[in-house]
Amino acid sequence: VVKQEVMNEKVKEEITGQLEITKVDANNTNKILAGAVFEIWKDGTKIDTLTTNKSGKATSKKLEPGDYTLKEIQAPEGYTLSDKEMKFTISNEKIEVVKLQITNEKD
């Protein structure tokens, strides 16, 4: 007779988040803007670089919980580069999508 004891341990689900950017004209938020380039930073390290597509959207997936800074490094053609840094947090409580709508002024 062979006895074997098996123990199963529930693996904790990895919690990650996403950042979804929508880039629009400052004076007409219905006008979407493609070609804006952003960098995501965490603790002084660049995590990702995103470029908005023809729908004015860019998404970064699998962001670990923590505090991040989003910096625009290239404005869409004909628009002024924003010098604002946007802070956002990915929660360690649940999987989430952080959505930011960001505007640019025309040149």
Feature roles, as predicted:
Residues 1-107:
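Solvent-exposed loop/turn and edge beta-strand elements of beta-rich ligand-binding domains
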